[in-house]
Each structure stands twice: as C-alpha cells, then as structure tokens.
C-alpha cells in the first residue's frame, strides 16, 4: 500500500511538473515577425464581433456551412475579454492621421438588399480588351465585389453594431480623424443609395471613442462652385456644432473645418476660384463657412490649377505607387517643396496595397501586392521623409479596390479563394498603423524643435 501511494505521488508530481512546463512555454510564445507580438494576447486591440453582424443575415451562415471552406491559422479572440476595453486602454488618437471611410455598403437586414457588395464587373473602354473579360454582378454573401473578405461579412454601413466595431478598430489603430465619403442628401454613386441620413450616428459613435470626422466630398453630376457652396453650408449648419466635427488649426491660429474634394480636377480652376478666393463671386472666404479645402492632385500640372483655384492644399489619395504623378512616392519631396513655397498644405496618402480585379478584371497591371505589410510600411516611411503636417490613409474600407486596413479573414468557396492577411492576424494593418502613428507623433516633436 505504501509503495502504491509513493508511486502515485511520484506520477502526480511528474504530471504537475509537465503542466507547469507547458504553461510556461505558452506564456512566452509570440509570432516571430510580429512588430508588437500578438495584439490579442497583449490586450492592445479590441476584437471584432463578427457573429453579432452575421447572425442578422439569415442566409449567410447556411451558405458558409454548405458551400464554403473558411481557412485560417489564427485562433479566435476571446470576445468578452478583448472587446470589453476601457477608453484608457486605447492608444491616444493622432488627429494628424486621417483615414478615408466608406458608408456605401448595405445588406438585406438593414437595407432590404445588398448594396455595393454585389458590385458589377466594369467593362473596359476598349472593345477588343472588353471582349476578353466577363460581365455580370457579384452574388453575396459568399461572392462579394472585393478580392479580400471582411471579418464582419457583407455588412450594412448603417448597422449600429458595425459602426461601433469600425470606430473601435479605427481607435485601436491610433488614427484620429475619419474622412467620410459624402454625397449630398438624396444623391449617391451609381451603385449605391444615399447615406447622409446616418451621418449623425457616425458622428455620435466617433465622439464616444474620441475620434473626429471630416468630409470627403465625392463628385456628383453638375458639381460646381455654386453646388459645393450649398454643400458646405449644409454640412456646417447641420454638423458643425457636433463635438466630433473636425477642425484644423492653421498657422495663424484659426480653427477651420477641413474638406477633401475628390476628383477636383474635373472642374476648371476658374470655377473653383469663384468659391475659394476672397474676390470670387461665390466666395466663402472670411465667412462662417470658410474652411480648409483640399484638392486631389493626380497629374503634376494639377498643382498650378490647384493654386489658381484657391485651394488650401492637396492630397494624393491613390494607394498605388507609380500609378499617377501624385501617388508616386518619388515625387512627394518636390510636391511638398511646391506647397511650402506657395503656402499650401500637402497631405500625402498612403495605403497597404491595391487590387481591384474583382470589379475591374482587366486592371491587373495596377495591382500592388501587400508583401505582408512591407508595402504599407514603405509608403508611410516615404511620407514621413517629407515631414507632412497630416498624413491620409487610403483606406479603412474601400474593399472594391483592396486598399482596406479593416480586419479581413481567409475564405474560399467552390469558385474562388479570397486574398488574406496570412500569416498575420485579421487586424495586422490596424497594428501596423498604430506602430507608425506612434512613430509619426514622436518624429513631429523633433520637427518642431
């Protein structure tokens, strides 16, 4: 009996020792090439409630079970632990880091149909090339108009739980300003529906996370100096008093709202001068509706048009290095010099990569591989070299063009396999953004010395 008890004690001791050894090993594990280690394990970033969104789409889970294989090498984050973060656990928001945000997505639960996820395949303008590629529309939830698949599934931009998840992701990345894609009330892009009605929800939720919001005004039919003046008056009157409404402090001490004007070059400089110069017929300068107006620079010649048009500066938007003069990193130094000489604000735009072959199957030459985050880091580093006052990110969720930093998951169906962020976790680009945001803030302190 004594011998049996001794044997039992020895066996139990060995078992306990092995358990302790395994626990100690697990405690010190982390990905070899992770900049900060696992963001989930460190508790740095909030998790993302994919289930809370997908459960609202009745057909989605059935499709996932029957027709798809979801592949992932990552473990699911412990939802309760990761999601329940106090505000002080987020990194400080960097209000000099802006991110382009799109509100045009819809699904049957919230919008009565899929919007934008079922994007059509766009036809090439050259008939000879167009004949070599298919036409048609995507068929969500498994077939969406994107080369990557969102962790939240084909969501609705007006879903309160999605807005909350997005604000958490953005705040976790240390970005401070959301540049929301905007059309006037009752107007939308060709594949969307009007979205101005839920801007208040975005402002409210952004404020709850300490974020600011400005407006990225999209091109619409007959946009000109007169209509844009009406847009600015509407935005400032309706949203200007909201605590989340972003205002930029100028060198002379004024605080003014900032507007990005997408595709500004399609309108003549003379027309813009009517609105943006002090002597213009529609001038808003030195009125309650004055602001910082950022033009889009694509070609080199646009910088002179932008100056004549009365803009306060320009941004480059495209996340495709080499695609345009403005998006090419090698030109940022000369563009910044031009802005310094002419008292303009230069905002370079950086992005994690580019791929839009899900909607433009013929446009493979403009694909920019993410290279596991290296492309993104190279772009941000190039931006920092010119010491910009603001950097913009293209984008949080432009899924059609594959520029998103929003969380994405591996997924494949019987017909296709989506691109993914492996070997990294779904939030790797949020983590990289945080890393570089902190570097940006530290470097700016030295620039000001």
UniProtKB/Swiss-Prot annotation:
Catalytic activity: N-{alpha-Glc-(1->3)-alpha-Man-(1->2)-alpha-Man-(1->2)-alpha-Man-(1->3)-[alpha-Man-(1->2)-alpha-Man-(1->3)-[alpha-Man-(1->2)-alpha-Man-(1->6)]-alpha-Man-(1->6)]-beta-Man-(1->4)-beta-GlcNAc-(1->4)-beta-GlcNAc}-L-asparaginyl-[protein] + H2O = alpha-D-glucosyl-(1->3)-D-mannopyranose + N(4)-{alpha-D-Man-(1->2)-alpha-D-Man-(1->3)-[alpha-D-Man-(1->2)-alpha-D-Man-(1->3)-[alpha-D-Man-(1->2)-alpha-D-Man-(1->6)]-alpha-D-Man-(1->6)]-beta-D-Man-(1->4)-beta-D-GlaNAc-(1->4)-beta-D-GlcNAc}-L-asparaginyl-[protein] (N-glucan mannose isomer 8A1,2,3B1,2)
Leading EC class: hydrolase
One Pfam family linked to the record: Glyco_hydro_99
MF-aspect GO terms: alpha-mannosidase activity; glycoprotein endo-alpha-1,2-mannosidase activity
Spans within the Lumenal topological domain: 30-449
Keywords of the record: Golgi apparatus, Hydrolase, Membrane, Signal-anchor, Transmembrane, Transmembrane helix
Enzyme Commission code(s) on record: 3.2.1.130
PANTHER family (alphabetical): ENDO-ALPHA-1,2-MANNOSIDASE, GLYCOPROTEIN ENDO-ALPHA-1,2-MANNOSIDASE
Protein name: Glycoprotein endo-alpha-1,2-mannosidase
Gene expressing this chain: manea
């Amino acid at each position: 009996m004594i011998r049996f008890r001794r044997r039992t004690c020895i066996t139990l001791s060995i078992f306990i020792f092995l358990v302790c050894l395994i626990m100690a090993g697990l405690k010190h594990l982390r990905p070899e090439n992770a900049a900060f280690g696992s963001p989930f394990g460190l508790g740095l970033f909030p998790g993302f409630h994919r289930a809370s969104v997908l459960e609202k789409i009745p057909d989605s889970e059935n499709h996932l079970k029957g027709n798809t294989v979801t592949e992932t090498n990552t473990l699911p984050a412990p939802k309760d632990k990761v999601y329940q973060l106090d505000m002080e656990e987020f990194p400080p928001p960097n209000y000099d880091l802006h991110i382009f945000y799109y509100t045009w997505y819809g699904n049957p639960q919230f919008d009565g149909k899929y919007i934008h996820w079922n994007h059509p395949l766009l036809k090439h303008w050259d008939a000879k090339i167009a004949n070599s590629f298919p036409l048609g529309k995507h068929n969500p939830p498994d077939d969406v108009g994107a080369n990557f698949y969102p962790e939240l599934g084909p969501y609705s931009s007006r879903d309160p739980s999605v807005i909350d998840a997005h604000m958490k992701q953005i705040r976790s990345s240390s970005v401070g300003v959301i540049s929301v894609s905007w059309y006037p009330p009752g107007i939308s892009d060709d594949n969307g529906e009007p979205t101005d009605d839920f801007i208040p929800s975005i402002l409210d939720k952004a404020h709850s996370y300490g974020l600011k919001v400005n407006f990225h005004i999209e091109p619409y039919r007959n946009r000109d100096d007169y209509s844009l003046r009406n847009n600015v008056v509407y935005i400032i009157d309706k949203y200007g008093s909201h605590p989340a409404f972003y205002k930029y402090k100028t060198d002379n001490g004024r605080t003014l709202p900032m507007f990005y004007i997408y595709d500004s070059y399609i309108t003549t400089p003379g027309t813009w001068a009517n609105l943006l110069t002090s002597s213009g017929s529609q001038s808003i300068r030195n009125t309650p509706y004055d602001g910082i107006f950022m033009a889009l620079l694509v070609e080199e010649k646009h910088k002179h048009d932008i100056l004549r048009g009365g803009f306060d500066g320009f941004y480059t938007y495209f996340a495709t290095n080499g695609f345009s003069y403005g998006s090419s990193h090698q030109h940022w130094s000369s563009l910044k010099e031009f802005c310094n000489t002419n008292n303009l604000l230069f905002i370079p735009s950086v992005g994690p990569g580019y791929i839009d072959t899900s909607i433009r199957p013929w446009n493979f030459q403009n694909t920019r591989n993410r290279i596991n985050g290296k492309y993104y880091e190279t772009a941000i580093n190039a931006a920092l070299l010119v010491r910009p006052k603001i950097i913009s990110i293209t984008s949080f969720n432009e899924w059609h063009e594959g520029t998103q930093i929003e969380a994405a998951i591996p997924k494949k169906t019987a017909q296709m396999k989506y691109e993914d962020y492996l070997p990294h976790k779904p939030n790797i680009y949020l983590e990289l953004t945080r890393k570089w945001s902190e570097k940006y803030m530290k470097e700016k302190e030295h620039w000001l010395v």
